[in-house]
Swiss-Prot record:
InterPro entries: PPIase_dom_sf, PPIase_FKBP_dom, Trig_fac, Trigger_fac_C, Trigger_fac_C_sf, Trigger_fac_ribosome-bd_bac, Trigger_fac_ribosome-bd_sf, Trigger_fact/SurA_dom_sf. Pfam families: FKBP_C, Trigger_C, Trigger_N. The keyword Isomerase applies. It comes from the Bacteria. Keywords: Cell cycle, Cell division, Chaperone, Cytoplasm, Isomerase, Rotamase. One of its GO terms (cellular component) is cytoplasm. This is Trigger factor. Residues 163-248 form the PPIase FKBP-type domain. Involved in protein export. Acts as a chaperone by maintaining the newly synthesized protein in an open conformation. Functions as a peptidyl-prolyl cis-trans isomerase. The gene is tig. It is an enzyme of class 5 (isomerase).
Length: 438
């Protein structure tokens, strides 16, 4: 087989492929053997009709169609390997010549991985904040811990208070008509958390189990259903159960109950350390992303529309899959969020293109710098993943190999190394902050 590649646009090539007549004869025979098994030809058992008889009965075209379904994908993959192109879209195939006894001639157009012209990616200047944690942040985290380990006690007698966990049914109407997102049954609500709006929870205080109350509500402007946002509604609420938190005292006994520490002081120190580590990770992420953006800004790269389209589909699926899994249709989701599928695509598309630019630039830096993922590094990453998924590392490797996903791990390692290189060669300006970035 002969194959050549010609650049016809910035990120698009045309493959010219010539397949030997003998190979065409071979796939035509394979097509005949496959189709004749299902053929119903008078006077012959299935699979026994000679090829000339089959062709007279079904026509040669049926053989050619079946043969090309086998030949084109194989020829395309071989041409890609022979020419060394990196396709990023589905191929568009034009059969130029298809005659028995003559070479098959194909013209195949496909988008390819775009060329990246790097700008300056060393000595970039970036600002990095200093992670600091205030006493009030530590206190807030300990209070969350108290609430997390609080006992919930059912209140048989008594009324709703701020901080209670109540189960309610509610139905909202506007001018007597129900609206999307305005009703639910057995909804658990923590009173005071601003279930719908901050002033709404105040109307729940004082209600008793079994009581129904009509509560007027000005629907917030940021309500998901934009058709009713800002309008006046009437919410009919029935309280079905009241539970109240019993908080433990914040002392050494509490520290022993919720941690491995014997004293509140030790628990407080550990809490501060965790908050500092989280702040450091966030600041590190922001700094690394800023460096990537700087490197992209200095580079020249044009992402093919086909690549953006594919990434856009992936990002759309990531948004919609959880919605559908929860039983909501796409149509209801778009109505609830006051958008259309087209407007959502338009919003996401720039992010899809930007994410691809970042990957292409970082991949090019890794290539220029000769960065690779060693097998030891791949094994270490597999060990982390295996621990997370509670699998044996060898079993995880087997699964990833079956899915052809091991290369994605190698790519991720190389990209991390490329960003590490940006950081190592950057001019990092520290900026004091009184509190950790939130």
């Amino acid at each position: 087989m002969k194959a050549s590649a010609e650049k016809i646009d910035k990120n698009r090539v045309e493959l010219q492929v010539e397949v030997e007549p003998e190979r065409l004869d071979e796939v035509l025979n394979q097509a005949y053997r496959k189709l004749v098994r299902k053929a119903n030809i008078p006077g012959f058992r299935p699979g026994k009709a000679p090829r000339p008889v089959f062709e007279r009965f079904y026509g040669k075209q049926s053989l050619y169609e079946e043969a090309m379904e086998q030949l084109i994908p194989r020829a395309y993959l071989e041409a890609v390997a022979d020419t060394g192109i990196q396709p990023v879209s589905q191929p568009e195939v034009d059969v130029v010549q298809l005659e028995e006894g003559k070479p098959v001639i194909l013209k195949i157009q496909v988008d390819v991985k775009p060329e990246v012209v790097l700008g300056e990616y060393k000595n970039l200047k970036v600002e990095r904040q200093v992670a600091e944690v205030s006493d009030s942040e530590v206190d807030e985290e300990l209070e969350k811990l108290r609430n997390r380990y609080a006992k919930l006690v059912t209140i048989e007698e008594g009324t709703v208070e701020m901080g209670d966990i109540i189960t309610i049914d509610y139905e909202g109407t506007i001018n007597g008509e129900p609206f999307a997102g305005g009703s639910a049954t057995d909804r658990s609500v923590e009173v005071g958390k601003g279930f719908v709006a901050k002033d709404f929870d105040a109307h729940l205080v004082g209600m008793s189990t079994g009581e129904t109350r009509e509560i007027p509500l000005s629907i917030p402007e940021d309500f998901p259903n934009k058709e009713v946002a800002g309008k006046e509604a009437l919410i009919t609420v029935t309280v079905k159960e009241i539970k109240r938190k019993e908080l433990a005292d914040l002392d050494d006994e509490f520290a022993k109950d919720v941690s491995e520490h014997d004293t509140l002081e030790a628990l407080r120190a550990e809490t501060r350390k965790k908050l500092e580590n989280a702040a450091e990770k966030k600041i590190e992420y922001v700094m690394r992303n800023a460096l990537i953006s700087e490197a992209v800004a200095g580079a020249e790269v044009e992402v093919p529309a086909s690549m953006v389209d594919a990434r856009l589909e992936t990002m759309m699926e990531e948004v919609l899959r959880p919605v559908i899994e929860q039983g909501m249709t796409k149509e209801d989701f778009f109505k609830l969020t006051n958008q259309t599928e087209e407007s959502m695509r338009a919003d996401i598309r720039p992010r899809a293109e930007e994410s691809l630019k970042k990957e292409l630039v970082i991949d090019r830096i890794a290539e220029v710098e000769g960065l690779e993922a060693t097998e030891e590094e791949v094994d270490a990453e597999l060990a982390k993943m295996a621990e997370f998924y509670r699998l044996e590392a060898d079993r995880l490797r087997e699964i990833l190999e079956q899915r052809n996903d091991l290369d994605s791990i190698r790519t991720a390692i190389k990209r991390d190394k490329a960003v590490d290189l940006l950081v190592a060669n950057a001019e990092i300006v520290g900026q004091e902050s009184t509190e950790a970035e939130k």
